Amino acid sequence: MRLRNDCLVRLLTSWFGIFCLYEMTEGSAEPPPCPGARRRRLLLSLPNVFPGRTRAAPEPSVPSPPPSPPPPPPPPVSVPPPPSSPGGSESLIECPLCLVRQPPEEIPELLSCRHRSCLRCLRQYLRIEICESRVNLRCPECAERLSPQHVRAILRDPLLTRKYEEFLLRRCLAADPDCRWCPAPDCGYAVIAYGCASCPKLTCEREGCRTEFCYHCKHVWHPNQTCDMARQQRAPSLGVRRKHPSGISYGQESGSADDMKSCPRCSAYIIKMNDGSCNHMTCSVCGCEFCWLCMKEISDLHYLSPSGCTFWGKKPWSRKKKIIWQLSTLIGAPVGISLIAGIAIPAMVIGIPVYVGRKIHGRFENKKTSRHKKNLAVTGGVILSVIASPVVAAVSVGIGVPIMLAYVYGVVPVSLCRGGGCGVTTANGKGVKIDFEEDGPITVADAWRALKNPSIGESSMEGLTSVLSTSGSPTDGLSVLQGNYSETASFAALAGGTLTGGMLSGGRAKYCRLEVQADVQKETCQKDSVSLGAVSDSASTRAMAGSIISSYNPQEREVNNMEIQVHIEAKPSRYQLMSESSTEESLHASAPLVESEDAEACRNQVAACDITLAQPESIRSDLESSDAQSDDVPDLASEEYDSPHLFPPSPSNALQESPPHRMCAQEEGLCAHEESLSKVEIIELRV
């Protein structure tokens, strides 16, 4: 029994040795075993389990089998080195702007973001932005702003850096409402005038400038004019003009004045493309946000106010439309608010639980939770929202309805009437009057449209018209007066008393005809014939020679040739029409003098008539006095003025006028050739 156990122990020991040798030969290619496996292997070895028995047992005489040779190791695998690119192209970085690969030192890193561009592209980009007065510089690839220190480091140009700093200063000062820049050319001096509204005269303190300008209109000081008058005087010089072959300048095209306006803060001119864009504009120079229609700095609620400005329209609402909208809002506000509240309450009571249930269900949908827990959470949320939704609806309606009513009946009417848009005025003890007419001042755009199609006719009667007035003094003459303060350049022709006082009122003629033909060197012209009836020595009428161009500065006036032919037909037996020479303009009219035995009495009573065309500078008549004289004259377009019996003679002069009338009637058959024809050939008017 003992021998059998010794043989079994030796056999197991030999097998274990062979197994360990095999592991040693195979372990060179495998990682070493973990310490736990080695410990288990040592514990399972039989000599360690039975140390005493192995020593006492004699060694067997049976030789152990030779160990098997280990397998040859696998040949080493050579890993080829990575191929090196020629010229070191791995160190080059591609610029995202010009797509050129450049070394890293030519592509700096921006401090505000991680985008990188080459120095050449960055300098060109900054140069373009600064030259166009855009100092809010950003990264070319994103909206991150560039710091001034980084801009200076990239530019390395003293002149461009100075311009950039000047534009930065101007942008900061433009936000100050009391900052005023000197209007003199090449003067960059600014005056910060606090509390100078009552004393608007400012003086530039720069040495060598000393320009005086106005605090309100920010232009050169106008001592004898208001800001509106000075603005109207400067308005024609702002428009771009084109020359007509006749020498008259008109606007370039229709609507060009509406496409170009100046910023209300920095006065930089801005052109708006007619592409259907909105009216909310942002100045790229100073960053001012303003409305293109009213040209005022606005907020986000401007287009919701009753100002009449629309977000997409091309012009603001008229006063009539604003008043109608206001009245309809006041009347329909209770109905509309009640309807909104009636719809909002059930919508909130039903919609809030549905919204809460869907949100809770969507949150638990992607999570591995039990079905019962999910249903419990959704049910609890819906029950709580059903309880809270009526309270939320009541609070919302209770707060929202009073706010809407206060806005409709309080804020809207006050803001509308404060801006003068409601047109409600109180008459002198006659109650409240609502004015629907637009009586605003004439803008540059309106004057520009009026310049496009100048005409001679009925449309020109709206401005200062030519007035042919007569007086009883025989020394009065025919003169031309040019209006300086009217919207359209017009001429006032004053006929002397030699026509009415010396000839017509003398009882030798019942009427005379004045035919005016004006030629402004245009393709078409209009001819008007008017008749003058004499009642008294101061009879006057109003005739328009034509609206030529709108009022502009005298130094910008051009020379236009106007040909006026005046045909004066009268019935006296004899009269003489003489002329006096002037410096530049001449008016000469002559009539043949025919003597007869029957007209000897008439010839003694008719005095010589002189008609003189004076220079425009020689007449300084007031516009109001000219209009006052012309208000008493009837319309000239009527054909009834051609009749000799247009105005009934007064009873006191009836007996005095009838004998000469019979005398002239007898002379018609004998002296038909005595009708005079006077022509004013060419009058050169300096406009």
UniProtKB/Swiss-Prot annotation:
Q: Which family does it belong to?
A: Belongs to the RBR family. RNF19 subfamily.
Its biological purpose: E3 ubiquitin-protein ligase which accepts ubiquitin from E2 ubiquitin-conjugating enzymes UBE2L3 and UBE2L6 in the form of a thioester and then directly transfers the ubiquitin to targeted substrates, such as UCKL1. Involved in the cytolytic activity of natural killer cells and cytotoxic T-cells. Protects against staurosporin-induced cell death.
Positions of Zn(2+) 4 binding: 263, 266, 283, 286
Q: How does it sit in the membrane?
A: Multi-pass membrane protein
MF (Gene Ontology): ubiquitin conjugating enzyme binding; ubiquitin protein ligase activity; zinc ion binding
Query: Which segments does the record annotate as RING-type zinc fingers?
Result: 95-144, 263-294
Query: Which sites bind Zn(2+) 3?
Result: 214, 217, 222, 227
Where do the record's region annotations for TRIAD supradomain lie?
A: 91-313
The family database entries (CDD domains) matched by this protein are listed as:
Rcat_RBR_RNF19, RING-HC_RBR_RNF19B
Instruction: Map out region (Required for ubiquitin ligase activity and for protection against staurosporin-induced cell death) in residue numbers.
Output: 1-294
Taken from the record, one Pfam family name reads: IBR_1
| Start-end of Pro residues biased regions | 60-85
- Assigned EC number: 2.3.2.31
Q: Which domain of life does the protein's organism represent? A: Eukaryota
Designated name of the protein: E3 ubiquitin-protein ligase RNF19B
Pathway involvement?
Protein modification; protein ubiquitination
One GO cellular component assignment for this chain's record is: endoplasmic reticulum membrane
Q: PANTHER family annotated for this entry?
A: RBR FAMILY RING FINGER AND IBR DOMAIN-CONTAINING (PTHR11685)
Q: Which processes are annotated in GO (biological process)? A: protein ubiquitination; ubiquitin-dependent protein catabolic process
Q: Where is this region: Disordered?
A: 53-88, 618-662
- Give the residues the record marks as binding Zn(2+) 5: 291, 294, 302, 309
Q: Where is the composition biased (Acidic residues)?
A: 629-641
